[in-house]
Amino acid sequence: DILAAFRVTPQPGVPPEEAGAAVAAESSTGTWTTVWTDGLTSLDRYKGRCYHIEPVPGEETQFIAYVAYPLDLFEEGSVTNMFTSIVGNVFGFKALRALRLEDLRIPVAYVKTFQGPPHGIQVERDKLNKYGRPLLGCTIKPKLGLSAKXYGRAVYECLRGGLDFTKDDENVNSQPFMRWRDRFLFCAEAIYKAQAETGEIKGHYLNATAGTCEDMMKRAVFARELGVPIVMHDYLTGGFTANTTLAHYCRDNGLLLHIHRAMHAVIDRQKNHGMHFRVLAKALRMSGGDHIHSGXVVGKLEGEREITLGFVDLLXXDFIEKVRSRGIXFTQDWVSLPGVLPVASGGIHVWHMPALTEIFGDDSVLQFGGGTLGHPWGNAPGAVRNRVALEACVQARNEGRDLAREGNEIIRXACKWSPELAAACEVWKEIKFEFEAMDTL
């Protein structure tokens, strides 16, 4: 069975058992009345069952309802169908004030019907010939308004300075100021020029997201013809059907696939209604993607440390134990489905490097947008600065030093032999993004 953990907030006067049973029925075989066609099938075989209810600590009106769904209810290899069944209709149910899907346990038999990520972590490292450290990325800013040529120049400078990847922003598709084909051509030129100068393999996440699946595939095919290593997709706005289609193409044609989670906070930000990001992350691993943005723990975008580490494990590890402190309600066996690299991004800069290296480990992409392009001397020195800081942190960690306690000292020591790093440390020494969370609903 597929197991689901729902956070249920019943209407006043509705007992939790009734609310849990209603969720199970409405998201499987139930309807609002008895129908004569019920007699034509074996409902006992197909109906969802609420098998356990427990209170949420500290919340009088909320309960966790555990529901089991028979596997026969789901089409093989279709995340779209899985979500349509489990969360398609039940969230507007009048007996509930609010409902949140906290976690899913995907059984081994169902996992094996999915191809998963096009390549996975190890194959990506082999393709790029980069080992023993996190990968470095940068989103090109300003995200909208640059011409294709000026955009390509920014890409070249960042890659030449020492980054592994640069990135289209999620909303860069094919706008009047920069059509997709021009951007792809100038970015490919930047990649090849930077590779020739540095001797390293470089990439730029070319955003293939489009208004139709046909246009999306046309862009992916053009990227492959240019010989670039990676394309990108906005998987929530683009949809799971489009994402799985693109992932299959990428595996068959040797392209890596970077996934952006634009729109996720619409679904996952409220604490008592919607769907937790760990469910969206599991779904992405099944649908297919080699990288996905996972929050930063530090920086400007929200991400609580333990919870973030919980879905970083879900993305990368093969077997994940149930750990309630990390919000993981079920053990999950991925049966060797390839892993996904978590991408840390959002308001991070050089002083965050020790914390990011410690928290995310080697199998991650650290993405500094403003933290690269905001360098007072320009893009290439910004990239140099990030690469120097990363190498210093990785070396210190490998020597057994404590990055949590000695992080600032490690960065300061590296400043002595990197003027680019020293200049940036001076600029960003005081910047913090510390706001109280407003969404306490």
Curated annotation (Swiss-Prot):
Substrate binds at N89, T139, K143, R261, H293, S345. InterPro entries: RuBisCO, RuBisCo_large_chain_AS, RuBisCO_lsu_C, RuBisCO_lsu_C_sf, RuBisCO_lsu_fd_N, RuBisCO_lsu_N_sf, RuBisCO_lsuI. Its EC number is 4.1.1.39. GO terms for biological process: photorespiration; reductive pentose-phosphate cycle. Mg(2+) binds at K167, D169, E170. The keyword Transmembrane does not apply. It comes from the Eukaryota. The record marks K300 as: Transition state stabilizer. Its main location: plastid. The keyword Metal-binding applies. Gene3D superfamilies: Ribulose bisphosphate carboxylase, large subunit, C-terminal domain, RuBisCO large subunit, N-terminal domain. The basic functional RuBisCO is composed of a large chain homodimer in a 'head-to-tail' conformation. In form I RuBisCO this homodimer is arranged in a barrel-like tetramer with the small subunits forming a tetrameric 'cap' on each end of the 'barrel'. Heterohexadecamer of 8 large chains and 8 small chains; disulfide-linked. The disulfide link is formed within the large subunit homodimers. This is Ribulose bisphosphate carboxylase large chain. The gene is rbcL.
